Amino acid sequence: MNSKGQYPTQPTYPVQPPGNPVYPQTLHLPQAPPYTDAPPAYSELYRPSFVHPGAATVPTMSAAFPGASLYLPMAQSVAVGPLGSTIPMAYYPVGPIYPPGSAVLVEGGYDAGARFGAGATTGSIPPPPPGCPPNAAQLAVMQGANVLVTQRKGNFFMGGSDGGYTIW
């Protein structure tokens, strides 16, 4: 096939002498101490002493001014409170706090296509599914507040939530 012969052999790579490696082969770290205390109980995590003072304030309501809202504003962010010194530096979310009997307005939370039971005429707020955190309306109901939910705005072009189709 080829009259010139085979390809020339390549020289072997020279063997490196065993010297000092650039990185240490083993890294000696101190062993972490074993846990001696049990983790805190669930009830200890949610005691009022663990709530950050800034997270526990509720805005005052006054109807003395014309046009003043009679509803508490819905908290948009979740406050985070540091825990006591017995627990390592960890932060647990602290939800909005509503006094019992107050009215909370959730704008755009009502879904016209939602049904809460067979023949249900009055709305009820179902509990959150297992493993899911509650939404703002569910938190307010759990704390004894009254919840007013306004209807979500929808139109022909934006579509609704009733599962219908738009044919173009």
Swiss-Prot record:
Keyword Nucleus carried by entry: yes
Q: Where is the composition biased (Low complexity)?
A: 1-13
Whether Disulfide bond counts among this entry's keywords is no
Modified residues annotated as Phosphoserine in this record: 77
Q: Where in the cell is it found?
A: Cytoplasm; Nucleus; Nucleus speckle; Nucleus, Nuclear body
Posttranslational modification:
Ubiquitinated by SMURF2, leading to proteasomal degradation. Ubiquitinated by NEDD4, leading to proteasomal degradation.
Any Gene Ontology CC annotation: nuclear body
Q: Where does the record place the region Disordered? A: 1-25
Principal location class: cytoplasm
Superkingdom assignment: Eukaryota
Q: Which Pfam families has this protein been placed in?
A: DAZAP2 (PF11029)
Which GO terms of type biological process are on file? positive regulation of RNA polymerase II regulatory region sequence-specific DNA binding; protein destabilization; stress granule assembly
Matching InterPro entries: DAZ_assoc-2
A molecular function annotated in GO for this UniProt entry is: protein serine/threonine kinase binding
Question: Where can the motif PPAY be found?
Answer: 39-42
Coiled-coil segments: none
> What role is this protein assigned?
In unstressed cells, promotes SIAH1-mediated polyubiquitination and degradation of the serine/threonine-protein kinase HIPK2, probably by acting as a loading factor that potentiates complex formation between HIPK2 and ubiquitin ligase SIAH1. In response to DNA damage, localizes to the nucleus following phosphorylation by HIPK2 and modulates the expression of a subset of TP53/p53 target genes by binding to TP53 at target gene promoters. This limits the expression of a number of cell death-mediating TP53 target genes, reducing DNA damage-induced cell death.
Subunit-structure text? Interacts with SOX6. Interacts with DAZ1 and DAZL. Interacts with IL17RB. May interact with FAM168B. Interacts with INCA1. Interacts with EIF4G1 and EIF4G2. Interacts (via PPAY motif) with NEDD4 (via WW domains). Interacts with transcription factor TCF4; the interaction results in localization of DAZAP2 to the nucleus. Interacts with transcription factors TCF7 and TCF7L1. Interacts with transcription factor LEF1.
State the name under which the record lists this protein: DAZ-associated protein 2
Q: Which gene encodes it?
A: Dazap2
